[in-house]
């Protein structure tokens, strides 16, 4: 399964920003969790409103927030701990909505480009 961080329009990655603040042991635990996701293991993920919360049963209860895109692709939105869970979920949901909007806009733009190419070909005839 392909696992990729969500990159915002400004080029930043909320997941990477969170990950970079972790200590070495926590970063190792999160890396193992990400590897499990890449292997398709979502048994530690609780799903709600399109967002998945991967629970790491260690330390302060680390979480990774994600969404599935089809059956072979996972998008990472960020992370947090049990203590900040509700605000982390809210942030992940905002990022997920932004992701879906940008994806929809990209599809619409490609469709417009394809239609414009067809029109130009017809005009050349």
Annotated model-derived regions:
Residues 1-61, 70-74, 81-125:
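Basic, Lys/Arg-enriched alpha-helical interface segments
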């Amino acid at each position: 399964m392909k696992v990729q961080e969500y990159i915002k329009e400004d080029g930043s990655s909320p997941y990477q920003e969170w990950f970079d603040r972790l200590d070495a042991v926590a970063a190792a635990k999160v890396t193992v969790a990400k590897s499990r996701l890449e292997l398709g293991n979502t048994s530690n993920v609780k799903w709600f409103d399109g967002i998945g919360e991967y629970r790491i049963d260690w330390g302060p209860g680390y979480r990774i927030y994600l969404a599935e895109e089809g059956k072979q692709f996972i998008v990472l939105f960020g992370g947090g701990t049990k203590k900040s869970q509700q605000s982390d979920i809210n942030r992940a949901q905002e990022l997920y909505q932004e992701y879906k909007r940008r994806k929809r806009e990209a599809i619409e733009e490609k469709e417009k480009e394809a239609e414009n190419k067809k029109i130009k070909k017809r005009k050349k005839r």
